[in-house]
Design a protein with these regions (language model features):
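Glycine-rich beta-strand-centered segment in the early N-terminal region that forms part
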Residues: 1-27
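Short helix-loop-beta connector
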Residues: 15, 48-51, 74-85, 149-150
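Hydrophobic beta-strand signal
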Residues: 21-22, 87, 155, 176
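A structural motif shared across PLP-dependent enzymes of the aminotransferase-like
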Residues: 27-40
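Short, glycine/polar-rich helix-capping loops at beta-to-alpha or helix-loop-helix junctions
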Residues: 31-32, 115-123, 183-186
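Mid-domain Rossmann-like dinucleotide-binding core that forms the NAD(H)/NADP(H) cofactor-binding site
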Residues: 56-137
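Glycine-rich cofactor phosphate-binding loops and adjacent beta1-alpha1 units
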Residues: 77-81, 127, 131-199
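C-terminal hydrophobic helical "lid"/dimerization subdomain
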Residues: 211-255
Length: 255
């Protein structure tokens, strides 16, 4: 989250002084800089109700969730809500927190999250999860207890074996993974005609894809959901001031 200090002659929609947000491009330095140069197509006006620190907590996780749920899974949209069932594996993390909120905004179906500790389960419920299952226990019996025959979409931050997921995903369902895995047996998915996708929200800016401007439009939609109080920031700690010591402190806290 930042303020526009200068804009190129071909930039449309932004002026000096605009309060904006973006997640940047990992091939372009500037994360810890006072100023950074960014492609205007991956930027939008930030929600006026948020502080700059609160706004900074959302773009990366919210864009990852948007691309996973809307671009890949096609769970629904803010304008056309569905009734599909969604599971977030790893619900208490940054992406999980954003994905639960976004899912509640685009589907009327069950939004279930996995968690293993009471405090993280409570966090997921605070984010809007309609059900919690323990990922340290067998998943299928817990899913059956909710009366869910299969999830239309699953977003996974900690992907379990394919055979485990094949039991709980609906035919023609969609799995999106944001983690890395050494091996994944796709044959377990064949009988249900399932789709598997990996997700990195940096792909569009990194490779300058023809639809790179979708990222700016997604951020504008996310900002609208924030103003409608359907998505809230997930910041739990604020270290004030851009100094070398604070950068080290914040990095250590994340690690």
């Amino acid at each position: 989250a930042s303020v526009v200090r200068a804009a190129g002659s071909e930039v449309n929609g932004f002026s000096v002084g605009d309060e904006v947000w973006h997640s940047g491009n990992r091939d372009r330095p500037g994360t810890y800089s006072q100023f950074t140069l960014v492609d205007s197509r991956i930027v939008s006006k930030r929600p006026p109700s948020l502080s700059i620190a609160e706004a900074a907590s959302l773009p990366l996780t919210a864009l990852t969730s948007w691309e996973a749920l809307i671009d890949h899974i096609r769970l629904g949209t803010p304008e056309e809500r569905s009734n599909k069932a969604f599971l977030m594996i790893g619900g208490a993390g940054g992406v999980g927190s954003a994905a639960i909120q976004l899912a509640r905004a685009i589907t009327s179906g069950p939004v279930v999250a996995t968690s293993s500790r009471p405090e993280s389960a409570q966090w997921c419920q605070d984010m809007g999860a309609t059900g919690i299952i323990n990922h340290r226990e067998p998943l299928a019996p817990q899913v059956n207890d909710f009366g869910i025959t299969g999830f239309d979409g699953i977003l996974s931050a900690y992907t379990p074996p394919a055979s485990t997921l094949a039991e709980i995903i609906a035919p023609f369902g969609h799995l999106v993974m944001i983690d890395g895995t050494d091996s994944f047996d796709l044959m377990a998915f064949k009988s249900k005609s399932l789709t598997v996708t990996s997700e990195s929200m940096f792909s569009r800016p990194q490779f300058a894809t023809p639809d790179v401007a979708e990222q700016g439009r997604a951020l504008a939609s996310i900002a609208d959901l924030v103003e409608k109080r359907q998505i809230r920031p997930t910041m739990t700690r604020h270290i004030e001031g851009l100094t070398a010591q604070h950068v080290r402190e914040a990095t250590a806290a994340v690690e």
